Amino acid sequence: MKRLIKDFTFDELKKWVEETGEKPFRANQIFEWLYKKNATDVNSFTNIPTQLRKRIEEEFILNSLRVVKYESDGESIKFLLELVDGNAIESVFLPYKYGNAICISTQVGCRMKCAFCASTIGGMIRNLSAGEMVDQIVNIENITKKKISNVVLMGSGEPFDNIENVFKFIDIINSKEGKNIGARHITISTVGIVDGIYKLSEYPKQVNLAISLHAPNNNLRNKLVPMNRKYSIEDILKAVDYYISKTNRRVTFEYALIDGVNDSIECANELAKILSGKLVHVNLIPVNPVNGRNFKKPPKERVKEFYNVLILSGIQVTIRRELGSSIAAACGQLRSRHYNISEK
């Protein structure tokens, strides 16, 4: 069975090259074709000996994805990507003034069961490999003809539910031989898997941490984010404090504002109270409507009122620029709509 070549770190590929009897520098050349030139056809590896190219073709898959469809709202572009086994994932290309970002998936489906998220529709199918995550970047760079400088692991799936592959993915794209994307330009978003936060605290690369909080108290969060029954807000905040003490990195708390659910002034005051004095940033996200879920975004005036409460409490906060509601840009919507995936 062929292996995906992008599942290999540089050191792993160098070892494979040496085992074939070739010189180690061939690994540098192969990585240059894969990551600097985004080549997906071994026949384009013109400086690689024919015999080694043949060996690569026999043993490896160079591209694990194909684009099924994409939609654009004039700025962001949402991609539906099919894997070799027929499963599908989504990625979003996001152009900003500071550079181009990509929001990638880490799993096919998700088992976190967040109430407002389309990724959970149909349940969890499988983890993505490191190479399947890398291929989201390579394919979208090839299509858009734009270099990606920022990576957010905030698509379908829970990154800390696939932590070993996620760390390997980061090692590959951060390496100078690979994509050479700076660690501080990579963000992991989690619903609050406490074990993962502690592991990230010890991880040698200074990637960013974002917590999908969405509620200021356990009673409400238990309903919106069922994983809260295992990892409470208190557990998450304790882990975040440890992460900050180890890394001195500011943590982002994502808060999806849902009309009539978690957008009251009382909720804003509660949120300000639990985050006060911490090295954090709050990202307010007016929720995208999801088919089959009765959630809608609050009026702009209420979003601004919520924002003002946090600002007056001394908390750093932004309202996320709304991208992609017309293209079903929230996690999992394009996949569930295209394949008519329903709740399990």
UniProtKB/Swiss-Prot annotation:
Cofactors (names): [4Fe-4S] cluster
Cellular component GO terms held in the UniProt record: cytoplasm
Residues binding S-adenosyl-L-methionine: G157, E158, S189, S212, L213, H214, N288
InterPro entries found in the cross-reference section: Aldolase_TIM (IPR013785), Methyltransferase_A (IPR040072), RlmN_N (IPR048641), RNA_MTrfase_RlmN (IPR027492), rRNA_lsu_MTrfase_RlmN/Cfr (IPR004383), rSAM (IPR007197)
Record's keyword terms, sorted: 4Fe-4S, Cytoplasm, Disulfide bond, Iron, Iron-sulfur, Metal-binding, Methyltransferase, rRNA processing, S-adenosyl-L-methionine, Transferase, tRNA processing
Record-annotated disulphide pairs: C103-C331
Role: Specifically methylates position 2 of adenine 2503 in 23S rRNA and position 2 of adenine 37 in tRNAs.
Additional remark text: Reaction proceeds by a ping-pong mechanism involving intermediate methylation of a conserved cysteine residue.
PANTHER family associated with the record: 23S RRNA METHYLTRANSFERASE (PTHR30544), RADICAL SAM CORE DOMAIN-CONTAINING PROTEIN (PTHR30544:SF5)
Name assigned to this protein: Probable dual-specificity RNA methyltransferase RlmN
Protein's gene: rlmN
